[in-house]
């Protein structure tokens, strides 16, 4: 399920990665609280800054744009009440 959520968020992260940044060097971690239908409750909570304020802002904006989160493909699965998601500017840029 996490992969489908990240696939929803990543295309909405608009950030130009500065030269010399390596994978794993700058990671932002957010917690998102969810309703059973995947709708976000409240704002994403930043648990860890990447150290790149513009990237952190781009990630938070992208999380908000992906609302509601996709439903699980397995109809019997439930949406978690809370998710912790890690973002990396190099990884996110490689997949856009």
Task: Please provide the spans of the model-predicted regions.
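Conserved "boundary/linchpin" sites in short secondary-structure elements
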Residues: 7-14, 33-48, 57-71, 76-96
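Short, small/polar residue-rich loop motifs at catalytic or cofactor-binding pockets
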Residues: 23-29
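Surface-exposed patches in mature extracellular/periplasmic domains of secreted proteins
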Residues: 17-21
């Amino acid at each position: 399920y996490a992969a489908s959520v990240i696939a929803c968020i990543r295309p909405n992260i608009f950030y130009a990665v500065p030269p010399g940044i390596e994978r794993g060097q700058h990671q932002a971690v957010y917690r998102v609280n969810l309703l059973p239908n995947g709708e976000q409750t409240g704002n994403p909570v930043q648990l860890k800054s990447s150290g790149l304020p513009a990237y952190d802002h781009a990630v938070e904006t992208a999380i908000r744009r992906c609302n509601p989160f996709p439903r699980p493909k397995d109809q019997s699965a439930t949406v978690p009440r809370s998710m912790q998601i890690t973002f990396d500017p190099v990884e996110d840029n490689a997949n856009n």
